[in-house]
């Protein structure tokens, strides 16, 4: 739950606006046979600066030493390298409709154990200013483990516990408020009844006095 919440919030912040770009770390545990998103977000320091960006992804399988290129994405074109481990499994899930890429994430479908290892998301950006251009590059590193089934991390467990604690606290608070309001209404009703009774007795007493005065006068 904690992971899902973090992912949903991060995705909303990133997709809402370029100026609201937020760099969020990728998840690092994929489930065998499932689809997994490897997150790579690289924000510009100044959102108003014009830029063109492309990316190259490299991969080092667990137990090997060298990184190999698996894809390049530039000008809205995805170029996949010939690699049977990723053939028909890689889907672009980053920015679209712009050359100014800030979300450079990918999906890996039908994950296998061969996808365990280290990934590098190389981000190359050309910044255009009024009188000059400037090239920048950054590398985002992600270590991925493939497991048989999803494991609940401590953050997820703590988040769920906190959710139930919050529900209990809110329930107790609501009951206390209802009891307080009930007592307050009951006290007000009782006070009003006593006041009405006092007024009735006062009127009755006054009427008797008036009647007695009339009889004496006669």
UniProtKB/Swiss-Prot annotation:
Disulfide bridge positions per record: 21-43, 40-121
Signal peptide: 1-18
Protein's UniProt keywords contain ATP-binding: no
Topological domain ranges for the Extracellular compartment: 19-157
Keywords on record: Cell membrane, Cell projection, Disulfide bond, Glycoprotein, Immunoglobulin domain, Ion transport, Membrane, Signal, Sodium, Sodium transport, Transmembrane, Transmembrane helix, Transport
Chief place where the protein resides: membrane
Pfam families: V-set
Gene3D superfamilies listed in its UniProt record: Immunoglobulins (2.60.40.10)
UniProt topology in membrane: Single-pass type I membrane protein
Sugar-bearing residue positions: 93, 110, 114, 135
Localization annotation: Cell membrane; Perikaryon; Cell projection; Cell projection, Axon
Single GO biological process annotation from the record: regulation of heart rate by cardiac conduction
One Gene Ontology term, aspect cellular component: plasma membrane
Record has Cell membrane as a keyword: yes
Record-annotated membrane-spanning stretches: 158-179
Entry-linked InterPro entries: Ig-like_dom_sf (IPR036179), Ig-like_fold (IPR013783), Ig_V-set (IPR013106), Na_channel_b1/b3 (IPR027098)
Subunit and partners: A voltage-gated sodium (Nav) channel consists of an ion-conducting pore-forming alpha subunit functional on its own that is regulated by one or more beta subunits. Interacts with SCN1A; regulatory subunit of SCN1A/Nav1.1. Interacts with SCN3A; regulatory subunit of SCN3A/Nav1.3. Interacts with SCN4A; regulatory subunit of SCN4A/Nav1.4. Interacts with SCN5A; regulatory subunit of SCN5A/Nav1.5. Interacts with SCN8A; regulatory subunit of SCN8A/Nav1.6. Interacts with SCN9A; regulatory subunit of SCN9A/Nav1.7. Interacts with SCN10A; regulatory subunit of SCN10A/Nav1.8. Interacts with NFASC.
Similarity comment: family membership: Belongs to the sodium channel auxiliary subunit SCN1B (TC 8.A.17) family.
Protein's UniProt name: Sodium channel regulatory subunit beta-1
């Amino acid at each position: 739950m904690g992971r899902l919440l973090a992912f949903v919030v991060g995705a909303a912040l990133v997709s809402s606006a370029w100026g609201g770009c937020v760099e969020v770390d990728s998840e690092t545990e994929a489930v065998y046979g499932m689809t997994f998103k490897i997150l790579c977000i690289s924000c510009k320091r100044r959102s108003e600066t014009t830029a063109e960006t492309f990316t190259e992804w490299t991969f080092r399988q667990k137990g090997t030493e060298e990184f190999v290129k698996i894809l390049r994405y530039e000008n809205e074109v995805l170029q996949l390298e010939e690699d049977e481990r990723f053939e028909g499994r890689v889907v672009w899930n980053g920015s679209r409709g712009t050359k100014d890429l800030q979300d450079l994430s990918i999906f890996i479908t039908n994950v296998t154990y061969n996808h365990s290892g280290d990934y590098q998301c190389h981000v190359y950006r050309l910044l255009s200013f009024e009188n000059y251009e400037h090239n920048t590059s950054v590398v985002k590193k992600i270590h991925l483990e493939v497991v048989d089934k999803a494991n609940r991390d401590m953050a997820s467990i703590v988040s769920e516990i906190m959710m139930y604690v919050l529900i209990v606290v809110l329930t107790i608070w609501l009951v206390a408020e209802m009891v307080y309001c009930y007592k307050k209404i009951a006290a007000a009703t009782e006070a009003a009844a006593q006041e009405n009774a006092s007024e009735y007795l006062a009127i009755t007493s006054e009427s008797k006095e008036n009647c007695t005065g009339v009889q004496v006068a006669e």
